[in-house]
A protein has these predicted regions:
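The feature marks proteins involved in alpha-glucan
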Residues: 1-40, 72-155, 160-167, 174, ...
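Structural beta-strand segments of beta-rich domains
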Residues: 41-45
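Conserved, mostly hydrophobic/aromatic
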Residues: 47, 94, 156, 183, ...
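Short proline/glycine-enriched turn/loop motifs at strand-loop junctions of beta-rich domains
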Residues: 48-55, 575-578
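C-terminal beta-strand-rich structural cap/linker in extracellular carbohydrate-active enzymes
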Residues: 88-92, 599-635
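Substrate-binding/active-site clefts of carbohydrate-active enzymes
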Residues: 115, 135-148, 157-338, 617
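Conserved alpha/beta catalytic core and glycan-binding cleft of carbohydrate-active enzymes
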Residues: 305-307, 322-488, 495, 516-587, ...
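Intrinsically disordered, polybasic Lys/Arg-rich low-complexity tracts
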Residues: 633-696
Length: 696
């Protein structure tokens, strides 16, 4: 193939901005781009390799001969070449001559497409030719209040959610066809995909990225992934991607020692490597690396229309001593352990994205108490608009794993989150990290026998949905997947043939739909205006009760019994006189419960918990119940008590009548462990098996 070098000089502005760390669309300049020069169609290639002695483009088109297509150094560290005749899907790499005169073959850091592992070459691709149909979705999102709207996220791994009969994963477009009806039926607002940026090792789940501008070819082409997003948006479902700017792998064809020396990684060995992960840390203080990473983040939002990025491993970026022993790290210039360059990068990245697209989401997976994560960079914050609440997750899973006999002594784990619940814009995450590496699935974390496990999990889900903050649940946990997640296998969908699993799925579906329809559960998530304790301190009986409010003051009463004991005539103060109607009860028979219900309960005049009124309810064992709250009755010259958003000082929970086991004839008398009569399967005449073989 005849070689034609580009005579055109690089545009001054993108190059200048790139070297300043401010080219946030560097992918438009670097990489491979189909174009025509001097009447000849082909592609222009550009790469940043500041230490290289020479660079050439190699591929099938020149039999991978390094001397066939040498590139021209056109600027400080930037190499360029136009090659006529190049077409879409052509495979290529850069052959780089290092300062030590060694040849290294590297994939294009800015490639839009790549070969499927174990092959690792880059592919030429034109992403601009896709015909989008989601303008209505995009316009609607610009008008939505992302902070004060409902958000229930379904986290999934694209390759193992569901597979074809032959065990092959669906491609992106096929996956969308399977996923859309399920997500709509289940009531989720968003899906969050584990990383789909190209990666070499299946076992990393995508968290060791080799291609920051290429959706993994495991599941199809870039256009296939665009179609995935387009189909979900058409169905009213948002798409969030996991994005990994914290570190990258050492694979020889990737970013590691890209041109024979530290290029993308920090050159200081005490800052530039995560030894426990076997990965390299980006040099966040290098302007060209800043341009690369911010461009990647904006690329997925602007070119693939995704609705947000969940930024992985933020804590590892913030602290120089993260997972490092004494002597393995160095202080910053101020004598502290904070990574000042990483902080500045995160602030720049978030400001760039949310400045352009304020309706999008930047979500931090940050596991420490770092302050102001979701406050603007201009105010000293990191600039995210959401943060995973890892403290809540750890406390609640620890509490739920505890035998109910010992929960009284751990009651603070249920209530402690409210000391900081409104300090950040939190997402409550029950993610993939909690159901792998011997941690057990969520259902298997629950104590007790088969029935009790499901009752515990329903109680937890009801509490989680009512707790302030947006929601996230990993795939399979909505129907009680018993075994841990394995990225090589699809979920155990056959479990839905068993009553308890189908009933749990029905409960999660009803919770999601109720949540979306009930503004008090999401409209004021990040202020005491939207929450008020009624019973925070009944640790002896493991009961809590609280109110949620929407922006207009409409309330929902939530009561949780974390003990497997029936509580009859349980009294609690309520804000308004009138009838309190039971709306959702996790112990409902249709959810697999024992059927203890309240129906409607009328308030009784008499002070309790700072209110003038109180009610008496029956609390099923291991249950969460939602009650409607009647509107306040206006009294001339005398405002109703307890209508302020400030939480009234709670009194000790009133002792209910002596706990007792109900008479056998009453439906409410069934203990938790008692199995209800077998039900007929939904679409079959034979009775569903009651108990599948489970992993202990």
């Amino acid at each position: 193939m005849k070689q034609t070098q580009s005579a055109a000089k690089p545009s001054d502005l993108p190059v200048y901005l790139f070297h300043q760390g401010n080219n946030f669309e560097a992918y438009r300049y670097f990489g491979s781009h189909l174009e025509e020069q001097d009447g000849q169609p082909g592609a222009v290639f550009r790469v940043w390799a500041p230490h290289a002695k020479a660079v050439s483009v190699v591929g099938d088109f020149n039999s991978w001969v390094p001397t066939s297509h040498p590139m021209e150094k056109v600027s400080d560290g930037i190499w360029e070449l136009f090659i006529p005749g190049i077409k879409i899907y052509d495979v290529y790499k850069y052959c780089i001559t290092t300062p030590a005169d060694e040849l290294v073959y590297k994939a294009d850091p800015y490639a839009f497409h790549a070969e499927t592992r174990p092959s690792n070459g880059s592919k030429v691709f034109d992403i601009s030719s896709f015909d989008w149909h989601d303008a209505a979705w995009e316009d609607a999102q610009k008008k939505n209040d992302v902070i004060n709207g409902p958000m229930s996220i379904y986290e999934l791994h694209a390759g193992s959610w569901k597979m074809k009969e032959d065990g092959v994963p669906y491609n992106y477009s096929e996956l969308a066809d399977q996923l859309v009806p399920y997500i709509k039926d289940m009531g989720y607002t968003h899906v969050e995909l584990l990383p789909i940026t190209e990666y070499p090792f299946d076992g990393s789940w995508g968290y060791q990225v080799s291609g920051y501008f290429a959706p993994t070819s495991r599941y199809g082409t870039p256009h296939d992934f665009m179609e995935f997003v387009d189909k979900l948006h058409a169905a009213g479902i948002g798409v969030i991607l996991d994005w990994v700017p914290a570190h990258f792998p050492k694979d020889a064809y990737g970013l590691y020692m890209f041109d024979g020396g530290p290029c993308y990684e920090d050159p200081n060995p005490r800052r530039g490597e995560h030894k426990e992960w076997g990965t390299m840390v980006f040099n966040f203080g290098m302007p060209e690396v800043e341009s690369f990473l911010v461009s990647s983040a904006l690329f997925w939002i602007e070119q693939y229309h995704v609705d947000g990025l969940r930024v992985d491993a933020v804590a590892s970026m913030l602290y120089l001593d993260y997972n490092r022993r004494d002597g393995e790290w160095e202080q910053n210039v101020k004598g502290g352990k904070e990574n000042l360059e990483a902080i500045a990068f995160l602030q720049k990245c978030n400001t760039a994205i949310l400045g352009r697209h304020p309706h999008k989401m930047m979500i931090a997976e940050e596991s420490t108490a770092w302050p102001l994560v979701t406050k603007p960079a201009a105010d000293g914050g990191l600039g995210f608009n959401f943060k995973w609440n890892m403290g809540w997750m750890n406390d609640m899973l620890s509490y739920m794993k505890t035998d109910p006999l010992f929960r009284a002594g751990n009651h603070n784990k249920v209530t402690f989150s409210f000391f900081y619940a409104f300090s950040e814009n939190f997402v409550l995450p029950i993610s993939h990290d909690e159901v792998v590496h011997g941690k057990c699935s969520l259902i298997n974390k629950m104590p007790g026998d088969y029935e009790a496990k499901f009752a515990n999990l329903r109680t937890f889900y009801g509490y989680m949905m009512a707790h302030p903050g947006k929601k996230l649940l990993f795939m399979g946990q909505e129907f009680g997947q018993f075994i841990e997640w394995d990225e090589k296998k699809q979920l155990d969908w056959m479990l839905l043939g068993y009553d308890k699993h189908h009933e749990l799925q029905t409960y999660v579906k009803d919770l999601n739909h109720f949540y979306r329809e009930t503004a008090s559960l999401w409209q004021v998530d990040y202020s005491w205006e939207g929450f008020q304790w009624i019973v925070p301190d009944d640790n002896k009986q493991s009961v809590i009760a609280f109110l949620r409010r929407d922006a207009k003051g409409k309330m929902l009463l939530v009561v949780c019994n974390f003990n497997p004991v029936l509580r009859e005539s349980y009294s609690m103060g309520v804000p308004n006189p009138g009838t309190y109607k039971e709306l959702i009860n996790s112990d409902d028979v249709k959810y697999g419960g024992t059927g203890v219900k309240n129906g409607s309960v009328k308030s009784v005049k008499g002070p309790m918990h700072g209110f003038d009124q109180h009610i008496e309810v029956t609390l099923p064992p291991l249950s969460t119940i939602y009650f409607s709250v009647p509107a306040a009755r206006k009294k001339a010259g005398k405002p109703a008590k307890a209508e302020t958003a400030e939480a009234a000082k709670p009194e000790k929970a009133a002792k209910p009548a002596a706990t007792k086991t109900a008479a056998p004839k009453k439906r409410t008398a069934k203990p938790v462990a008692t199995k209800p009569a077998a039900k007929k399967p939904r679409a079959a005449k034979t009775t569903k098996p009651k108990t599948p073989v489970t992993e202990s």
